[in-house]
Design a protein with these regions (language model features):
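Walker A/P-loop NTP-binding motif of AAA+ ATPase domains
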Residues: 208-395
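C-terminal alpha-helical "lid" subdomain
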Residues: 356, 367, 371-485
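AAA+ P-loop ATPase mechanoenzymes
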Residues: 2-230, 243, 485
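Aromatic/hydrophobic pocket-lining residues that form π-stacking "cages" and hydrophobic walls in ligand
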Residues: 174, 260-263, 295, 401, ...
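Alpha-helical interaction elements in eukaryotic regulators
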Residues: 166-170, 217, 320, 374, ...
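Short interface patches used for recognition in eukaryotic signaling and trafficking proteins
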Residues: 158, 203-208, 362-363, 398-404
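Eukaryotic basic, amphipathic alpha-helical target segments in cytosolic regions
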Residues: 61, 65, 178, 182, ...
Length: 485
């Protein structure tokens, strides 16, 4: 796999001087002969669009050089749309249209807010005057798929220029920009990588300052990551590979995922930014071993980077364990790669993963929250519910709920709140808004709801307290049943 842009050139052989204006390179004649050739070709047998169209362009523009670049690696219009260049469509007079577009419907990612989607134009054939860094180019975008099959796509840019060096720089700049992340995360799923902006947005909502953890452990986690990415030269001086691996383990629902997201946010804010490579599954038509190969190649390409394997016990099964260990600690260099793995079941991991320091150097245990942490979590819900005047939630209620949720994970406490609020909403004419679970680890330190509770009788008058006790009882019975099973 290579990150270079697949471009090939036709250079002038006639020794003529470069033309000062792009239009001077075209031969005289009615309309655009290259456009006519494309449409003539598209209505006949299609064998190789590239050869037909490049021949037509060389005939029409004998004084210009030609570069052909694949759209999938060098999307010039997208690069311009991001503000790095400008372009205008060129409309030629003639018997055939100057361009061919297909109007496509783009459905919304979410319909909950009433979004109906939007329309967009897919260019099948287009001709443009393209301007970049003071240079002008005539470019054609051509969908040259040969035959009736939908795959593979053959969408190419044909770049005509009087300055071949500048055109090559444009292709390089566009390809480099296109391969980078732009407020996105690399996510591997179903056998391939995609840039995921939604995961990036989710991580941006998480910060270490707002995560409820033991303060000493939180400081260790933060320093472990920062010190690694700032210690490249130290590792080199010591003669050891610049790589590191951590395992987060413990009961589900106690902050492993939100800690990973907070780290993603922290690393994205660094200068230069540290990208994240996130593994969602190893399922692939080529098999899980091939998936691991592709994943680690991507991590090496973007190193220094943060490589995430959540629920590693379900990802790295016995069938791929040997291959995984070889990628982590084999002959290939993994300099700059910080691997983070999480699991709810450390005992299910092979000792070669969980007990080999050169692969995963340290393990961090995420236990059920203690009384202080549970009370802090209740203050989060107190703040979320503050705008709802129908829910009475004084400070004393936070402590009371924390005391009856011993051995509960954050996720179980969250479920108790959600179930209680839904029950109250079902009896209320004005339903309270269900708080977002994405923020359910936030530590609230201010804006507490005022009001004092004098005794237990006053507490029992609070609808939220009465309902949440019911839900805690139900959840605890379920926990006991699971333990007996």
């Amino acid at each position: 796999m290579t990150s270079s842009n697949p471009a090939y050139h036709f250079h002038r052989r006639n020794g003529k001087q470069n033309d000062p204006r792009m239009t001077s390179g075209a031969s005289k004649g009615p309309g655009d002969e290259a456009t006519s050739s494309y449409f003539d070709h598209s209505t006949a047998k299609r064998i190789n669009t590239d050869s037909v169209f490049t021949s037509a362009l060389k005939k029409q523009y004998p004084g210009l050089d030609l570069i052909v670049a694949q759209e999938m690696r060098c999307n010039l219009l997208e690069y311009a749309a991001a503000g790095h260049a400008t372009f205008n469509a060129i409309n030629d007079k003639g018997e055939v249209p100057s361009s061919l577009e297909v109007t496509v419907y783009l459905p919304p990612s979410r319909r909950m807010d009433g979004n109906k989607g939007q329309l967009a134009e897919l260019v099948i054939f287009g001709k443009f005057l393209y301007q970049w860094q003071g240079e002008e180019f005539v470019i054609y975008l051509v969908d040259g798929r040969d035959g009736a099959e939908a795959y593979p796509q053959l969408r190419n840019y044909y770049i005509l220029t009087s300055n071949i060096h500048k055109a090559e720089q444009l292709v390089l700049a566009t390809g480099s920009w296109q391969s980078d992340l732009h407020d996105e995360v690399w996510v591997f799923d179903q056998g391939g990588f995609e840039k995921d902006r939604e995961l990036w947005k989710s991580a941006q909502k998480s910060t270490w300052d707002a995560v409820i953890l033991d303060p000493d452990m939180k400081e260790l986690l933060i320093n472990d990551h920062i010190s690694f990415f700032e210690s490249k030269q130290t590792y080199k001086n010591l003669g050891v590979p610049w790589k590191r691996g951590l395992i987060y383990h413990g009961p589900p629902g106690n902050g492993k995922t939100i800690s990973i997201k907070a780290t993603m946010h922290m690393l994205a804010d660094r200068t230069p930014s540290i990208p994240t490579v996130y593994v969602r599954s190893l399922e692939s038509w080529m098999g899980p071993q091939y998936s691991l190969h592709v994943i680690f190649e991507k991590a090496r390409e973007f190193a220094p980077c943060y490589l995430v394997f959540e629920d590693i016990d379900s990802l790295v099964t016995p069938i791929v364990r040997s291959y995984f260990l070889n990628e982590v600690d084999g002959l290939k260099e993994n300099d700059g790669i910080f691997i983070i793995a999480s699991t709810n079941h450390l005992e299910l991991l092979d000792p070669g993963i969980s007990k080999r320091p050169s692969r995963f150097d340290r393990k961090y245990y995420f236990p059920d929250p203690n009384l202080e942490q549970r009370e802090a979590y209740c203050h989060f819900w107190q703040k979320k519910l503050k705008p709802n005047k129908d829910i009475k939630f004084p400070d004393e209620l936070c402590k009371a709920i924390a005391e009856i949720t011993d051995k509960f994970s954050f996720a179980y406490i969250q479920e108790a709140f959600v179930a209680a609020l839904l029950a109250i909403a079902g009896r209320s004419k004005e339903k309270p808004t269900k708080p977002s679970c994405d923020d359910a680890w936030v530590l609230v330190a201010d804006d507490q709801v005022s009001g004092k509770i004098r005794d237990a009788d006053d507490l029992n008058k609070l609808e939220l307290w009465v309902e949440i006790r019911k839900q805690v009882k139900i959840l605890r019975e379920g926990m006991e049943d699971d333990a007996d099973a």
